Amino acid sequence: MLSYEQVLAAPLEELAEAAAKWQAAIKPLGEQQDAYRDRVIVPVRDSDWQGADADAAKPFMDKVSKELRDATKEAEAIHGVLVDAHREIDIARLDLRRLTDVEAPKMGRTVGPGGEVKPLRPVDPDDPDTWGPHLDFFQALAWEEDVSKQLSKAIINARARAHEADRAAAWALWQDTGADDMEFNPGGYANVSAAKGGLGESKFRESSDFIFAEMKTNSASPKVAEIRGLVKGSEGPLAVISPVAGVGSRGTGLALWYEQVKTGGPWDHKPQLEKKFDLQSNNDFYFKVPGREVSVSDDIYSNIHYGYVGRAAGISRPELMQGANGGIASTGTNDPGDDMSMKVGMDLYEKYGDRMTKEQMDAAILKLVDDMEARRRAGDTTMTQVRPW
C-alpha cells in the first residue's frame, strides 16, 4: 500500500499535467477523424471507383478511419482515468493532512513518520494527572489505546483510498493502451470506478483459473494418493485432523493431511493469492463477480480446494468439517460462509470426481455466491465472504 509519506508527496501536479495533455489531444484527433471522413471516405464512397486499385485501397481507408475513431476514444478514456485518479488521490492527501493537522491535536495525539500515532501526553502509572479525574490507570490506558486506534484506522483508510485509485488507474491505463503500440483500444476504461470493477473481475477470473489448476493437480498428486492409501487402509471411529491425529494408518494419513492444509502449508492458498495479486487494503481481498454487483472474499478459493482435495484423499465429510471448525486447518476458525465454501468443494468431488471441468466449478462458485448473497440480504450478518460491490 502507498505509504503515509507517498500519499502526502504524491506528484499530483505531474498527474494533472498529463491529464491536460491528453485532453488537448482529444479535439485535434476528432477533427482529423471528421476531416478524413469528409475528404476521403465520403468522396470515394460516392464515386464509381472500381478495379484492383479500389479493391486494395478501400479496406485500407476503412482501417485508417477506424484507427482515428479508436485513437479519439482511447484519448478520452485515458484522460478520464487520469482526472479520476488525480481527484481520488487528492482527496486522500487532503484527508491525511486534516487528520494530522486538525484531528490529531483535538484528540491529544501526534502523527509521526509512517503515520504512526502517539499520545501527546501518554498515560503514566506514576502520574495520576495523566489519567483524568474519573478513570483509574487501566481504564485510562485502554481509552488511550482506543483513541489512537481510531485515528490510526482513519489514516489507513485514507492511504487505502489513494492506493486503490493508483492501482486501478495503472491497470486501466494498461488496458486502455493495449499491448501493441501500433493498435488502439477504444473499449477500455474511462474512469477509476469502472477500472476498479474491471480489475476486480480480472482477479476473480484469475483466481478461479488458479484454484482449478490447484484442485486438479493436487487431487491427483502422490501426496493425496499416499494419504488416501493410509486413510482407506483402516476402519474405525472418526479421527481428528491434527499434527498428532492418532495411531495407526488413518491417524498417520490425517496428520499428513494436516501438514498440507495448515496455515502456511503448501495448500494454504490465502497467502499465495495475497502474493499473486499483491493484496494490501481490505478492499483488495474482495473480487468483483463478473456480471453481478457483488464481490467475494478470496477466502472461498482455499476452502473449496480444501473440500475437493480432502474428499479426493478419502477423508470423510465429518472429519473435514471437524478439522476446519476446530481451527487447525488452513481455513482457520470457520463461520457459516466458510462451511458453505468447503461443502461446495466436497460436493464437486463427489459429483464429478477427477473429471470435473472448469465450467462445472465456475457454475458451482457462482451458485455459492448467489446463495451467500441471498442470506446476506436476508440479514445474515455471518455472510462476511460477500458484500455489495
Each predicted region: which residue ranges?
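Glycine-rich short-loop/terminal segments
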Residues: 178-308, 315, 319, 388
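N-terminal secretion-targeting helices of virulence/extracellular proteins
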Residues: 1-184
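Active-site or metal-binding loop neighborhoods of secreted/extracellular toxin and effector enzymes
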Residues: 324-389
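Short amphipathic alpha-helical segments that mediate assembly, nucleic-acid/protein binding
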Residues: 128-134, 208, 220-224, 237, ...
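Extracytoplasmic/periplasmic, Sec-exported soluble proteins
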Residues: 10, 49, 293, 297-302, ...
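Short, motif-level signal for alpha-helix interfacial/capping segments enriched in acidic residues
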Residues: 28-30, 278-283, 313-331, 373, ...
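Well-ordered alpha-helical scaffold segments within catalytic/enzyme domains
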Residues: 307-314, 347-352
